[in-house]
Amino acid sequence: MVKMNVETREELASLIDHTNVRADATENDIERLCREAVSYGFRCAVVTPTNVRLAAELLEGTDVTVCSVVGFPAGVSTPRVKALEASEAVENGAGEVDMVMNIGAMKSGNRELVYRDISGVVDAAGVPVKVILETAYLTDKEKVEACLISKEAGAAFVKTSTAYGGLAGATVEDVMLMRKTVGDEMGVKASGGIRDLETALAMIDAGADRIGTSTGVQIIEGWR
């Protein structure tokens, strides 16, 4: 099983996707997000599709990757729409994509639609795709199946949550289950409710190799 050995704050920062996907995020908010991402050495700046171009311009020439959410937050767009959204995000400068899978299809046992939903984005994007399972909605059996479909469809990561609308975010138990299911061949991103250093390190110890959070600065500043 993948287990990250984080010994410095710089190593921790390199695992963090610094995130602002708020509906009311202003250009000033995105500028601040990108400044912080560069200053602290975060892995990605995660934004909504409308802010990808701005973030890409701000981060040009840096080591920070722009990541766009797709099908966010509910995952209810059709596969064709998600694929188009992903393609446009990459054209505008995204180097990674975090997509919300079709949760209703997963709950209905419609494996074919879930696969088509994910593989369409993977093919259209041509960059690493992280599949948001929204674990709060799923049984353990469904979490395992969603991980296996994501792996089969060519995704680079499985991700716990959007944490949107008050839903529960990442748990250590879910991260452990996801890591056990995908093995060493995929990444596992923990996201949702990770607001302090202790929680971030617990997720990494459970098997996460990426952390999604809007409080990356506070997490890193907590390192002493």
Curated annotation (Swiss-Prot):
EC primary class: lyase
Gene Ontology cellular component list: cytoplasm
Main location: cytoplasm
Catalysed reaction, written as an equation: 2-deoxy-D-ribose 5-phosphate = D-glyceraldehyde 3-phosphate + acetaldehyde
Pathway(s) the chain acts in: Carbohydrate degradation; 2-deoxy-D-ribose 1-phosphate degradation; D-glyceraldehyde 3-phosphate and acetaldehyde from 2-deoxy-alpha-D-ribose 1-phosphate: step 2/2
GO biological process: 2-deoxyribose 1-phosphate catabolic process; carbohydrate catabolic process; deoxyribonucleotide catabolic process
InterPro entries registered for this protein in UniProt: Aldolase_TIM (IPR013785), DeoC (IPR011343), DeoC/FbaB/LacD_aldolase (IPR002915), DeoC_typeI (IPR028581)
Keyword NAD included in the entry's annotation: no
UniProt keyword terms in alphabetical order: Cytoplasm, Lyase, Schiff base
EC number: 4.1.2.4
Location in the cell: Cytoplasm
Active site, per annotation: D98, K159, K189
MF term (GO), any: deoxyribose-phosphate aldolase activity
Family matches, as CDD domains: DeoC (cd00959)
Tree of life domain: Archaea
SUPFAM superfamilies to which the protein is assigned, alphabetical: Aldolase
Keyword Lyase: yes
Chain's role: Catalyzes a reversible aldol reaction between acetaldehyde and D-glyceraldehyde 3-phosphate to generate 2-deoxy-D-ribose 5-phosphate.
Membership in a protein family: Belongs to the DeoC/FbaB aldolase family. DeoC type 1 subfamily.
UniProt name for this protein: Deoxyribose-phosphate aldolase
Species name: Methanothermobacter thermautotrophicus (strain ATCC 29096 / DSM 1053 / JCM 10044 / NBRC 100330 / Delta H)
GN (gene name): deoC
